[in-house]
Design a protein with these regions (language model features):
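Short glycine/proline-rich turn/loop motifs
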Residues: 9-11, 50-51
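Residue-level detector of functional hotspots within protein domains
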Residues: 14, 108, 142, 233-235, ...
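Extreme N-terminal leader/anchor segments
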Residues: 1-10
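Aromatic-lined, polymer-binding surfaces characteristic
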Residues: 16-194
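Carbohydrate-active enzyme catalytic cores, enriched for enzymes
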Residues: 152-280
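A sequence-composition feature that detects small, non-aromatic residues
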Residues: 6, 66, 71, 120-121, ...
C-alpha cells in the first residue's frame, strides 16, 4: 500500500544497498494500482525531496536518478495530477534539477546500460516539458551516439551480448512509445533501429523459443517482454540461419546453435565468455 511509504521516516531507515536502490529509484511505482491515493503518492515524493533536495552520492547515483525520473514522470496520473500549485512547482524543479545532473554526469558513466537509461530519462523530461527543448535535443543526440557506437550495421550490439540486445530493444521501444503518447513526431532512425534490433531478436529468441547460453547470456523469461511487444503491435521476423556471428540450425527434434563469430572489440568484451566455434 502506498500509504505505508507516506511517512518521512522511511527515508531515514538503514537498509542494505539493494533495498536502498529499489526504494530510491521509485520503480516500485509501476506496481501501484492507478486507484491508489494521489495524495499519498505525492506525499511520498514530497518526503523524498525534503530529505534529498541536496545532492548526495547515494540517492543521486546516476542509475538511481535516471530511473527515479522515469518513474515519477511515467506515473504522472498519481504523481502530478490534481496536485497543489506549490507541490507542482517543487516537483517540476526537482525533475529538472535531476535531469541537469544526468546531463552533467552521463559522460562519466562507463556502463552503456546506465547511459541508455540516463538518455531515456533525459528524453522523457524533454517530452514532458515542451518549453525545455534543450533536454529533448540533448537526449536525442545522446541516443544517436549510443546507437552509432554500440550497435553494428546488422542491428546487433557490438558486444555480441544477447542480454544487451533485449535491453536496447526494450528501451528504444519505450522511447518510441513516449513519442507517440506525447504526440511528437518519431525520429526515423528510432524506427530503423527498432526494425534491425527486432529482426535480431526474432533470430535469437522468437525463431527457437529458447535461450542460448553464449557470451554472458543466461536463462531468461521473455514472456512478459513478448506480451509487451504484442500489446503495442510490434512483430518481427527473420528467416536467416546466421547473424552477428551466431548460427542456428534446426529440425523438428534438434536445435544446434553455434558461436562462429570473432571476439568483440575489447571495449565491448566485459561479459564475453565463449570463444569462436562454441556449440550447444
Amino acid at each position: 500500500r502506498i500509504e505505508d511509504f507516506a511517512v518521512e521516516s522511511i527515508w531515514l531507515n538503514k537498509m542494505n544497498s539493494e533495498d536502498y536502490e529499489k526504494l530510491n529509484n521509485f520503480f516500485w511505482f509501476f506496481s501501484l494500482d492507478l486507484k491508489s491515493s494521489k495524495k499519498s503518492t505525492q506525499s511520498v515524493i514530497s518526503n523524498w525531496i525534503n530529505n534529498n533536495n541536496k545532492y548526495n552520492k547515494d540517492s543521486w547515483e546516476f542509475d538511481i536518478t535516471a530511473k527515479r525520473i522515469i518513474a515519477w514522470l511515467s506515473n504522472h496520473q498519481l504523481t502530478y495530477e490534481d496536485s497543489e500549485k506549490e507541490y507542482r512547482s517543487i516537483f517540476n524543479h526537482m525533475i529538472q534539477k535531476q535531469t541537469n545532473h544526468l546531463l552533467n554526469e552521463i559522460k562519466n558513466s562507463n556502463e552503456v546500460e546506465n547511459k541508455m537509461i540516463g538518455c531515456a530519462a533525459i528524453i522523457l523530461t524533454g517530452l514532458a516539458y515542451k518549453n525545455k527543448k534543450v533536454y529533448l535535443e540533448n537526449g536525442l543526440n545522446l541516443l544517436k551516439n549510443i546507437i552509432k557506437s554500440s550497435i553494428d550495421n546488422q542491428g546487433f550490439p557490438k558486444s555480441r551480448n544477447i542480454k544487451q540486445l533485449v535491453f536496447y530493444l526494450k528501451y528504444i521501444i519505450i522511447i518510441r512509445e513516449w513519442f507517440k503518447e506525447s504526440q511528437n513526431i518519431i525520429p526515423e532512425y528510432i524506427d530503423e533501429t527498432i526494425y534491425y534490433l527486432g529482426s535480431s531478436y526474432a533470430f535469437i529468441y522468437q525463431n527457437i523459443n529458447n535461450d542460448i547460453f553464449f557470451n554472458g547470456n543466461y536463462l531468461s523469461d521473455n514472456q512478459e517482454f513478448n506480451q509487451y511487444l504484442k500489446r503495442f503491435g510490434y512483430t518481427f521476423k527473420n528467416e536467416v540461419k546466421e547473424l552477428a556471428g551466431y548460427a542456428i540450425l534446426r529440425n523438428k527434434k534438434i536445435i544446434l546453435t553455434m558461436d562462429i563469430g570473432s571476439s568483440p572489440n575489447k571495449d565491448f568484451s566485459k561479459d564475453y565468455q565463449a570463444g569462436a566455434l562454441s556449440f550447444e
